[in-house]
From Swiss-Prot:
Coiled-coil positions: none
Organism of origin: Schizosaccharomyces pombe (strain 972 / ATCC 24843) (Fission yeast)
The organism's taxonomic lineage, starting at the top: Eukaryota, Fungi, Dikarya, Ascomycota, Taphrinomycotina
Domain of life: Eukaryota
One Pfam family, short name: SCA7
Quaternary structure and interacting proteins, as annotated: Component of the 1.8 MDa SAGA (Spt-Ada-Gcn5 acetyltransferase) complex, which is composed of 19 subunits tra1, spt7, taf5, ngg1/ada3, sgf73, spt20, spt8, taf12, taf6, hfi1/ada1, ubp8, gcn5, ada2, spt3, sgf29, taf10, taf9, sgf11 and sus1.
Record Gene3D superfamilies: 6.10.140.1270
Localization: Nucleus
The name this protein goes by in its record: SAGA complex subunit Sgf73
GO biological process, any: siRNA-mediated pericentric heterochromatin formation
Matching InterPro entries: SCA7_dom, SGF73
Boundaries of every SCA7 domain copy: 190-256
Keywords in alphabetical order: Nucleus, Transcription, Transcription regulation
Ranges annotated as biased composition (Polar residues): 123-143
Length: 344
């Protein structure tokens, strides 16, 4: 502890210790000031208790505004989240009514990603740097502008004098003549050479360019008289045209027969369905007389013979012994002419 003399030596100030002190409230503090001080003291005590409790506890109390998102006890309770269809924000299922009442339907903004520059262009810029030659003494100005740009960037300002550099990418490069494929050049250089016109099989009418028409004998662009007047044919035009039409008909018939054979082969080669085959056979049997293959006998043979014997006995009783009588009448017409007394 410093003595009074030492303190005066350290702080040489002109003041007297016995100086009279004037008080603001000589009679004591009023009631209003005392009440305010008490309220301030109680608030400070409550804050100190809360901070002490928070420091002692491991969990931190959440405000009431964050209950719809995290719940009152997020570490102890199981949270059931629901995503809103209007604003795409998650909230607890307990607060669905409160959220619908306060939901405005505005979705949160999506993060915008900047496009990544071409790696080849960046590598070229890094490798080149400032080593590229600049004509007409522009290199010094470029360096000066670059220095100014760096200073302005450090100070947080952009240099308006620096124009943006334009670089050509590989996509913007136009293909040169040497890059064209060799096949296209060969096609242009080597046109097709037309052969001589066969008058026996082709039209042969002279065209305005001095060449002969290379269409077939059935050419529809030229008239029949002009086609008949073509020289150099061994036979008349009509005979050659008829022979050509016959050949075409034979070809058409051959094609028809070939297609028919192919269709038959395809039908035989196709897989047979058992259900279709059964249905086909049943339809054929129904349409072939409607008679079963085996008939059921409703009356045995022995009983049928007994019926015949009784019928003959009755018929003989009605005849009164006349054996040469003609078999006519309702009853006698159904009688078999053999003796009923003789056993069968």
């Amino acid at each position: 502890m410093l003595t009074e003399q030492q303190t005066l030596e350290l702080f040489p100030e002109n003041w007297e210790r016995n100086e009279q002190v004037l008080l603001k409230y000589p009679d004591g503090l009023p009631k209003d000031v005392l009440a305010d001080q008490r309220v301030d003291n109680t608030e400070s005590q409550v804050k100190d208790e809360i901070t002490s409790n928070i420091t002692n506890q491991t969990q931190i109390l959440l405000p009431a505004d964050s209950f719809p998102q995290y719940g009152s006890y997020p570490n102890n309770s199981e949270l059931d989240y629901v995503v809103c269809t209007k604003c795409d924000r998650p909230f607890l299922s307990e607060y669905i009514e409160d959220h619908h009442s306060s939901c405005n339907g505005i979705k949160p903004p999506k993060p915008q990603f900047e496009p990544v520059a071409n790696s080849q262009v960046l590598n070229k810029d890094v490798n080149n740097g400032n080593n590229a030659p600049i004509k007409n003494g522009v290199k010094s100005t470029a360096k000066g502008s670059a220095g100014n740009h760096e200073k302005n960037s450090v100070n947080g300002q952009k240099n308006p004098e620096m124009p943006p550099k334009r670089r050509k990418t590989e996509e913007n490069k136009k293909p040169t003549k040497s890059a064209l494929p060799k096949k296209e050049a060969s096609k242009k250089k080597n046109p097709k050479v037309k052969g001589p016109v066969d008058v026996e099989k082709q039209c042969g009418v002279l065209l305005p360019n001095g060449q002969m028409c290379a269409r077939s004998l059935t050419c529809k662009t030229h008239s029949m008289s002009s086609k008949r007047a073509v020289p150099g044919r061994s036979q008349p035009y009509d005979v050659l045209l008829a022979a050509c039409q016959k050949k075409n008909q034979v070809k058409i018939q051959r094609q028809i027969l070939e297609t028919a054979k192919e269709s038959e082969d395809n039908q035989h080669q196709a897989p047979v369905d058992s259900d279709e085959e059964v249905s086909f056979i049943m339809n054929v049997l129904q349409k072939s007389g409607n008679q079963p293959l085996e008939q059921k006998v409703f009356l045995p043979v022995k009983r049928r013979h007994s019926y015949f014997r009784t019928r003959e006995l009755i018929a003989a009783a009605f005849r009164h012994g006349e054996q040469g009588m003609q078999v006519t009448g309702t009853i006698l017409g159904r009688v078999i002419p053999f003796s009923a007394r003789q056993p069968l």
